[in-house]
């Protein structure tokens, strides 16, 4: 076998090949032609359909991807106060280090943007996707939904509220889950929300893939809002994100008003019940 140490192979500590990153993100690299000719995929090492790649910056690893919707989603989730992975537009000078200007311009001319977010895992903390946790529960005769409602109810219900507001039709078992302590294998709470490049759907009856029950995002959110302290006023007062059109923004505001009303109704009913008990 090879005589290698973790220090030598850890991707958290060692440089990444820029040519591979360029190919994964843009599908082309000036210095990677021999391998490019055999590759027919937009990404090489990470899940999902969007073109993406890991790029090392001065303060750590960043995921670069094509998807301007992430910017709008970040702004809305900021206003809602829901924990999430923050996306920013990628710096031009860093893109120019791995790809030629023509291919970067082609993406921008299509109306898209290249965005980035900092890695959320580390050598000390891993992420466990929900679908992997479900497999574990199936082998140990445990109800995964009972576990998550006890382990991290606020983030679980906030996710359902956020997905309805964003019209996110692509929340699934591979893009949400738990943090895990690598020292002892114990699960922590849910990691921040991410992966919103399929948000802002115009469909009204999007099925929820995070609920225990067969229901829509709307139905799941109406139930969930009573268990969260999500604030809707900041979204209702904020300016429309430049990445969204008027129609998409109107739907966001309509859903916020709807859930705010439901939240007030639940709070009123709880106050009435407490008064009656006294």
What feature does the model see in each segment?
Residues 1-168, 177-278:
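Phosphate/dinucleotide-binding and metal-coordinating scaffold of catalytic cores
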């Amino acid at each position: 076998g090879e005589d290698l140490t973790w220090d030598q192979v850890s991707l958290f500590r060692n440089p990444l090949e820029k040519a591979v990153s360029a190919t994964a993100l843009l599908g082309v690299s000036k210095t990677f032609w021999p391998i490019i000719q055999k590759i027919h995929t937009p990404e090489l090492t990470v899940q999902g359909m969007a073109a993406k790649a890991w790029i090392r910056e001065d303060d750590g690893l960043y995921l670069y991807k094509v998807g301007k919707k992430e910017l709008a989603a970040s702004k809305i989730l900021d206003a809602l106060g829901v924990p999430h992975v923050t996306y920013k537009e990628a710096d031009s000078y860093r893109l120019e280090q791995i790809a030629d200007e023509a291919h970067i311009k082609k993406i921008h001319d299509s109306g898209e943007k290249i965005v980035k977010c900092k890695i959320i895992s580390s050598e000390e903390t891993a992420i466990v996707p929900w679908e992997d946790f479900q497999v574990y529960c199936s082998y140990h005769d445990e109800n995964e939904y009972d576990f998550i409602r006890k382990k991290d109810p606020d983030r679980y219900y906030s996710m359902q509220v956020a997905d309805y507001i964003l019209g996110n039709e692509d929340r699934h078992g591979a893009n949400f889950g738990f943090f895990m302590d690598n020292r002892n294998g114990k699960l922590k709470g849910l990691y921040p929300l991410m992966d919103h490049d399929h948000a802002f759907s115009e469909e009204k009856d999007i099925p929820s893939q995070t609920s225990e029950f067969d229901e829509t995002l709307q139905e799941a959110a109406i139930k969930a809002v009573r268990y969260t302290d999500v604030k809707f006023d900041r979204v209702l007062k904020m300016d429309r994100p430049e990445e969204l059109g008027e129609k998409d923004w109107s739907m966001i505001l309509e859903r916020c008003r709807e859930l705010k009303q439901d939240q007030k109704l639940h709070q009123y009913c709880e106050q009435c019940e407490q008064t009656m008990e006294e």
